[in-house]
């Protein structure tokens, strides 16, 4: 029984250590390197701040994005607009110009460039 408890504690300690290391790396990228967002192996985490994607994604939800080179219509994307990080659905793609819209909105937003997409 002691071996089982010891094994479980070791696994938990390992998981906690990994989470702390990842958190420290994220903080390093944002605070020290002054990046707008952190990226680990092509993945980034973002907390949704508005209800523009409701009911698909709610305020306070955390989205995980993966850096990608190809996006298609109806994909949910995260992109940088100035200093704002926005999560919207891709409505139309015309060359390098992309039209997005939040699921809770009827109006289209100004076109963005594909290079603005985070994931």
Task: Give the predicted meaning of each segment.
Residues 54-56, 70, 108:
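Short glycine/serine/proline-enriched coil/turn segments at secondary-structure junctions
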Residues 86-119:
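Extended, hydrophilic extramembrane loops/domains of integral membrane proteins
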Residues 41-43, 58, 72, 85, ...:
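Extracytoplasmic
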Residues 47, 76-78, 99:
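Residue-level detector of beta-strand face positions
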């Amino acid at each position: 029984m002691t071996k089982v408890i010891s094994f479980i504690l070791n696994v938990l300690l390992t998981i906690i250590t990994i989470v702390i290391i990842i958190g420290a790396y994220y903080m390093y990228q944002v605070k020290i390197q002054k990046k707008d967002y952190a990226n680990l192996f092509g993945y980034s985490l973002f907390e949704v701040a508005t209800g523009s994607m409701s009911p698909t994604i709610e305020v306070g939800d955390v989205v995980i994005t993966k850096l990608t080179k190809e996006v298609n219509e109806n994909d949910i994307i995260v992109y940088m607009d100035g200093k704002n990080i926005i999560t919207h659905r891709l409505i139309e793609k015309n060359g390098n110009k992309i039209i997005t819209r939040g699921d809770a909105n009827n109006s289209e937003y100004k076109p963005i460039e594909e290079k603005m997409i985070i994931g």
